[in-house]
UniProtKB/Swiss-Prot annotation:
EC numbers: 1.13.11.20
PTM statement from Swiss-Prot or TrEMBL: The thioether cross-link between Cys-85 and Tyr-149 plays a structural role through stabilizing the Fe(2+) ion, and prevents the production of highly damaging free hydroxyl radicals by holding the oxygen radical via hydroxyl hydrogen.
Reaction catalysed by this enzyme: L-cysteine + O2 = 3-sulfino-L-alanine + H(+)
Keyword line: Dioxygenase, Iron, Metal-binding, Oxidoreductase, Thioether bond
Name of this protein: Cysteine dioxygenase 1
Cofactor: Fe cation
Species per Swiss-Prot/TrEMBL record: Caenorhabditis elegans
Cofactor, how bound (note): Binds 1 Fe cation per subunit.
GO biological process assignments: L-cysteine catabolic process; taurine biosynthetic process
């Protein structure tokens, strides 16, 4: 069994290679058994929205972050702007709903898969598989998830589930390395 620090180090080692094996990354993410004492300092909640908390920038090759989900919180339906997305549940449960890419304008998105992941569950998503939304369906418990994005990205597209309408969004970090970010006066949110 590996620690959270060892997981971060081993992810960094994988990304020193020229070719990245998705299955190897999935196995590594699955090999870590969540221990809140190891990652708690990065898990910063906000009662009004889910938060993206940066853990490691991986020499510009990836972003590793912890997302914190209050009861009932959800992401928008979104793409990953050609990035690979690995998710590991560190605490609680998250439901992932996958959607097919919109084929027509002003038509509801088609759900292709709906799956709930409990603690230590691992998921993978990329744009070839479609769009997705992550949500904490619990009305009383929070959830925490570890996300690895390869390559890192600063924008994505959000989609209206009812119409398929696409809107470009800038993604920001609520905290970096365990410290809340103050964006007052910042134009890019990074």
């Amino acid at each position: 069994m590996i620690s959270f620090v060892q997981l971060v180090v081993q992810i960094r080692e994988i990304f020193q290679q020229k070719l990245i094996d998705v299955d190897e990354v999935m196995k590594l993410m699955a090999s870590y058994k969540s221990n809140a004492n190891e990652w708690r300092r990065f898990a910063i909640f906000d009662m009004n929205k889910y938060t993206r908390n940066l853990v490691d920038v991986g020499n510009g090759k990836y972003n590793l972050m912890i997302l914190c989900w209050g009861p009932g919180m959800a992401s928008s339906v979104h793409d990953h702007t050609d990035a690979h997305c690995f998710v590991k549940i560190l605490d609680g449960e998250l439901t992932e709903t996958k959607y097919a890419w919109p084929r027509k304008r002003h038509v509801p998105l088609d759900i292709s898969e709906n799956k709930t992941y409990g603690m230590n569950g691992v998921s993978y998503m990329n744009d070839e598989l479609g769009l997705h939304r992550m949500e904490n369906l619990s009305h009383s418990n929070g959830a925490v998830s570890l996300h690895l994005y390869i390559p890192p990205y600063s924008t994505c597209n959000a989609f209206d589930e009812r119409t398929g309408k696409k809107t470009q969004c800038t993604v920001t970090f609520y905290s970096k390395y365990g410290k809340k970010v103050d964006y007052r006066g910042s134009k890019n949110g990074n």
